[in-house]
Amino acid sequence: MSVHELNLTKDQHDWINGWLELWGAWVYTGRLEKRMSSMIAQWMESVEPSGYPTRPMCNDDDGMLISQVVDSVMCIDKKAFGILLSYYSHGSSKYSISSYYHKVASPRKMMRRGGERMAKPSLATCRREVDEILKASLFVLYTPLERAFKMRKRVDKIKRVA
């Protein structure tokens, strides 16, 4: 089975893309290290304007869950993890990620018209590779993330009866 056959359906892609966009905004705000659980902290955050544009983000529980899944799955490939973070957390376009990888790419064996030889990959090759890496990353993350959301236990708020 080749990488080209590993595709998600449109519904699956939309589901994981939506969650990863929310997670990326959550990671970008720096909440990975600090947990905002008190009402005062949430109120203060809403009163003080932030210095960066806000985008919709997930809550802390969802963010921590997604981070655990992404870390456990993407630790295999650091390049794919970097591309995933650049795309979802920092909001970089596929083109800007590709142009960065084109700038830092070192020559490697590539098939050319004259045969196989050492060459630096073109920007189009880098764009194709970044697109394939993102698609493969989403495919690899879909099943563990869906399973994690289904298996987690929701903590219901306990109401005290006075």
Located regions from the model:
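N-terminal interaction/assembly modules
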Residues: 1-75, 103-111, 115-118, 122, ...
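A short pre-motif secondary-structure segment
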Residues: 83-84
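Short helix-to-turn junction characteristic of helix-turn-helix DNA-binding domains
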Residues: 87-91
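Residue-level signal for the short linker/turn that defines the boundary of a DNA-recognition helix
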Residues: 92-95, 121
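Residues in the helix-turn-helix
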Residues: 125, 129
